[in-house]
Swiss-Prot record, chains A, B:
Gene3D superfamilies: 2.20.25.160, Zn peptidases. Belongs to the AspA/AstE family. Aspartoacylase subfamily. It catalyses: an N-acyl-aromatic L-alpha-amino acid + H2O = an aromatic L-alpha-amino acid + a carboxylate; an N-acetyl-L-cysteine-S-conjugate + H2O = an S-substituted L-cysteine + acetate. Its main location: membrane. This is N-acyl-aromatic-L-amino acid amidohydrolase (carboxylate-forming) A. Binds 1 zinc ion per subunit. SUPFAM superfamilies: Zn-dependent exopeptidases. One of its GO terms (cellular component) is apical plasma membrane. The gene is acy3.1. Homotetramer. Zn(2+) binds at H30, E33, H127. InterPro entries: AspA/AstE_fam, Aspartoacylase, AstE_AspA_cat, Aste_AspA_hybrid_dom.
Length: 328, 328
């Protein structure tokens, strides 16, 4: 066999992977991101009405931060979606522990324990953003074929809005998002939607993405071969803050109207970034063209982030199919 | 003189009104409506840099709810923009009084006292809404010629977004909004903008409206005659709540995609109102066609309001000019 043919054969060969036990669908990790809150409540209503058989695979539904949901706030004491690193999950709990640290450890026991063999196969954590990001799937690894195949599937099936994949690509123990507790999975961001508001159009897109994820897992477990190919992903590079008053730290400018709502565009040196409150334009000074995202996300003002920047690259994923007694 | 001619003469005659002492521009009455917060801060920066002469009339700037602004929340204890009725303003203050009741009484002493001769001539209270309401001027009286003339002026001058006038038309003593403290004035609503976010496009529109208000007062005080004519206004009729679960009171539906973002359209019997979280459409059952506004406003979920309904009517305002020694 020539080298070329061997490579071709290698490309075509399926990677055999274990069947997936099911999925945990989590909403309200941030209590004021309402599409996920109402979707989880709707799924729980469906289960009550029609029993577990409503889905073809085991589905766990979780309202992640019930106290924040009740108060319609992002969080009570601290951002829970920064509490799922190994370090925070192993912090001893005391009377003064933030509510979200306690709740994160509870969720880790329910869905994990992170890093152990018993963790959930997949978490799909539902979020909204005030940014015009369409449907964005965020996850931690550039080599998790199951997750990347689901992303690819959603990209093929959802046509109403752009579906993009964002890879953070840092060690899983340092990963601080809820979905990092499970073997596979992703954060599902849908926007634009204001905090404390549910928009039917955004809710419908989120529901379609969750239904398709369940659909993919069912098909995979049933033996469907998912063909490999290229997946275009965005990789986080750096964050950019708003211009601020050096003394008060108050913002002195807003995102420029020419950048607002243009998440994932190609931002080049000289392009407008900010419009100051007195009317001056601040332009981009980056040497390399990059893709901005989470542009003017409401929750990031306090984090000192006006937007993130990403680089686009292409991942090649192999074909995958479920491991059976014969294939194992 | 015939009756017709007398009527004609009456129409043409100017109403002479006292010069206006200035305007109070208030932002952050709701702490997470950021355009007004940043506009007031910018005006204060300009005054610091260039002195009081920066405006041709006396301008007072007020950050109405500084604690809520600091926490980026609508309010701390209670909605302050419901605290300016005579009843709440005269409630005795105790240790357990809500922060906003105390602050409303402070503001009433600063800008009022409501109902007395010493009140500010005009308050312009800056707000944002998550609804697609463009620029909406809200005020209490259908016969306040000064305010209606400023509305008319803004309608003529601002072309980027629709400028609409909403009249609540109930007794001034019961009126609970901050602007009701002054002789004239209005609440200036600009949207759509998420809570906790400032969008440059929305900020620029709000700034233009405030600049034009100052401009109108200056021209009026300088003797300009403002010609009378018709002003189209919307009058509040009733509120409509979301469909809710009878037990939990949770929402069971969101505003329908065909209604979302269509504030001030004409809503007729049979038009879609809501889309339930399981996919069913709820339609309008009103006998009379009406105009919905504040559609899906984030702050109104807790108030049990999915949208308000209004009726459109036309007000005829007379020409106005400033009272001088000669004319008085």
């Amino acid at each position: 066999m020539t080298e070329e043919k061997a490579e071709e054969k290698n490309k075509m060969a399926s990677v055999f992977l274990p069947a997936l036990g099911g999925v945990a669908v989590c909403g309200g990790t941030h209590g004021n991101e309402l599409s996920g809150v109402y979707l989880v409540q709707e799924m729980e209503r469906q289960r009550k009405e029609r029993g577990d058989g409503v889905w073809p695979i085991p589905v766990t539904t979780v309202l992640s931060n019930p106290r924040a949901v009740k108060e319609c706030r992002r969080y009570i004491d601290t951002d829970m979606n920064r509490c799922f690193s190994k370090a925070v999950l192993s912090t001893p709990i005391t009377d003064s522990s933030p509510y979200e640290v306690r709740r994160a450890q509870e969720l880790n026991n329910l869905l994990g324990v992170k890093g152990s063999d018993d963790v959930m196969d997949m978490i799909c954590d539902l979020h909204n953003t005030t940014s015009n990001m369409g449907l964005t799937l965020i996850h931690y690894s550039a080599s998790d074929w199951v997750t990347l195949h689901i992303c690819k599937y959603l990209q093929t099936k959802i046509t109403k809005v752009p579906v993009r994949v964002l890879v953070l690509d840092f060690p899983i123990n340092d990963a601080y998002n809820l979905e990092s507790v499970s073997k596979h999975g992703f954060t599902l961001e849908v926007g634009p939607q204001p905090q404390g508001v549910v928009r039917a159009d955004i809710y419908v897109i989120m529901k379609e993405a969750v239904d398709l994820t369940i659909d993919w897992i069912h098909k995979f477990n049933s033996g469907t071969v998912f063909e490999g190919g290229d997946v275009e992903v965005f990789k986080f590079i750096k964050s950019v803050d708003y211009p601020r008053d050096p003394e008060t730290r108050n913002l002195t400018a807003a995102v420029h109207p020419q950048l607002q709502d243009r998440d994932f565009c190609l931002l080049k040196r000289g392009d407008p970034l900010f419009l100051s409150f007195s009317g001056e334009t601040v332009t981009c000074e980056e040497e390399e063209p990059l893709h901005p995202f989470f542009i003017n996300e409401g929750a990031y003002y306090e984090k000192g982030i006006a937007f993130h920047l990403a680089k686009k690259w292409t991942l090649t994923v192999p074909s995958v199919q479920v491991q059976t007694t014969n294939s194992a």
